[in-house]
Structure formats: C-alpha cells, structure tokens
Amino acid sequence: VFYPVARGKYFASIEGDDYWCDPHKLQLQVDFLESHPEYAACVHNTVIHTCGSAEPDRPYITALSGDRDVDFETVMLGMGKAYHTSSLMARRELMIDPPKFYYTAYSYGFGDQPRAVWFALNGGIRFIDRPMSVYRVRSNPQSWSSNLDRHYTQLKRFVQGELAMIDDLMPFLSGENVEIAKD
C-alpha cells in the first residue's frame, strides 16, 4: 500500500475509470480539513453512471441529505457504501501504520470499509452533499460490482472478510460501538 511512502498532508482516492467532475473538489476538501483538524477525512456525493445503458445517472448516496458527519454506525451498516472511494480525501498520517483490522480486510480483497471505520474512530468523516466525482458501473466486466453480481464465491469471501475484520476491530471499540459492530 502506498500510504507510508506518500508525501503530503492528505491523500485523495480515485480508481479505474472513475473520475472527478468538479474542478474545485480538491481545494474544497483541503480547505475543510485545514479548518477542521479534528476530522480524519472529508467525502462528498458521487454520481453513478451506468455505461451502455439508457438508465439516467443517479446519486451514489441517497440516505444522507445536506452536509453532515458520517459516524461509525453509518460506516458499519453501510457495508463499505457510506461514501464512494472517488470522493475520499483524508489525513495521510492515519494510514502510515493502520491497525490490524485494516490488513485483515485488505487480505480478503477490500479496503474501503476498514479505512472508513478507522477514519470514523479517529475524528470522524465529513460528508459534503455535492456530487464531485463519477462512478462508472459495468464499464469493465472485471470490476468489483460486476464480480459481486456474478460470483457467489466473491460474495462469500467478502462476508468472511467482513467477519474477520470485525473480530480484529473489537479491541478498538467501546460502549454502543461494540453493539453496532456485532449487529
């Protein structure tokens, strides 16, 4: 993982054929994190574009409205869909030496949810209700979303990874967060 060798105060994520569609995205997120040092990360809404379909574009996040905090419960119950990867900007220092539960999940092939959990536990995540990136689905038959739709074994592995991650996560939790993780 690139975090230990990356330079700079923050990192922003983008994968594959997704793209940023707002020229002010990075500056807005840097400005937020600079003026709110208590937050670990800042995310925003994303547009879902289904390639090869007449289906209209739609927002990735529909359960949240307005700028708000993304808490631990939202991250856990969202199963990695509390925000889209292309929307993330976070403090690099938090990923220099991430906890074991991150590596456990990563070994199962996913890293978005454990990273979001870590940020939620270390200052929180701010959601900006403004679409600033585009997530293209079904544009690559080998994409994560296509594989989950087509392959039961991939889904089974995801669930196994989720359970293993939760086991490793428990030492970091207290109070109601323990119950949320168990649910």
Sequence positions of predicted segments:
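C-terminal, non-catalytic tails of nucleotide-sugar-dependent glycosyltransferases
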Residues: 84, 89, 155-182
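The conserved acidic donor/metal-binding loop of glycosyltransferases
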Residues: 15-19, 45
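Short, high-confidence coil segments that cap the C-terminus of an alpha-helix
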Residues: 8, 36-39, 123
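Conserved donor NDP-sugar-binding/catalytic core segment of glycosyltransferases
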Residues: 24-58
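Alpha-helical elements of Rossmann-like donor-binding domains used by nucleotide-donor carbohydrate transfer enzymes
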Residues: 24-32, 114-118, 161-164
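Conserved nucleotide-sugar donor-binding catalytic segment
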Residues: 4, 44, 62-150
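Glycine-rich, basic loop-to-helix element that forms the pyrophosphate-binding segment
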Residues: 1-7, 28
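Short aromatic/hydrophobic "clamp" motif used to bind/position activated sugar donors
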Residues: 11
